[in-house]
């Protein structure tokens, strides 16, 4: 009779452990569903979500290992039910393993909460980046407008240079004694043309690199400043050339 009571007690413990294992599996499935939802949110994040992907992957791997351990525990529980008369010590071993699984499930819950927090933080950072991008796009448009103004000024200088070239050509027929001065003027015009081509090349380079937002804006502003200095130099050179022509 005592043996039957002991067997019944062992069976009740096995059933209790079976229920604990089922509950743990239900919780793992619930965690898996929540994790799937977090994965969908994670896929929408950009840039800063790379670190989050790794941490969620670690949580998934931990959940997979927990499910494998639960399956092993269930198998051992079935074996224990068939051999319930072996020893009470074997039951204690199973109880200890179930407790360890419970502790690991609590750790997984903490990891899941942390993953949710990281996902929310990634969403916030993405919104900040989006706002910053709007601001940079506005600055980029203004920089492009300044570049267009610089190109218009370069066109005006080119027209002035053509006029000077025409004046110099008309002076070539005046007298051979001015040939040395005319050669000097032609050399100055060539230098001015080279500077103008260099300014146009820099403007084209600025347009090709405009996609690099913040760095491009800084580069454009620097090139615009250089273009202004070159334009001032060109005006000074042209004024000097015209003055020399007037003095001939």
From Swiss-Prot:
Q: Which residues carry this modification: Phosphoserine?
A: 6
Coiled coil is among the record's keywords: yes
Residues that the record marks as modified (N6-acetyllysine) are 177, 215
Gene3D superfamilies attached here?
Answer: 1.20.5.170, 1.20.5.370
**Gene Ontology molecular-function annotations:** actin filament binding; identical protein binding; metal ion binding; protein heterodimerization activity; protein homodimerization activity
Residue numbers bearing the Phosphothreonine modification: 216
* UniProt feature, compositional bias: Basic and acidic residues: 33-47
Q: What's written under domain?
A: The molecule is in a coiled coil structure that is formed by 2 polypeptide chains. The sequence exhibits a prominent seven-residues periodicity.
Cite the record's note on assembly: Homodimer. Heterodimer of an alpha (TPM1, TPM3 or TPM4) and a beta (TPM2) chain.
State the protein's name. Tropomyosin alpha-4 chain
> Which lineage do the record's taxonomy fields give for this organism?
Eukaryota, Metazoa, Chordata, Craniata, Vertebrata
Q: Which gene encodes it?
A: Tpm4
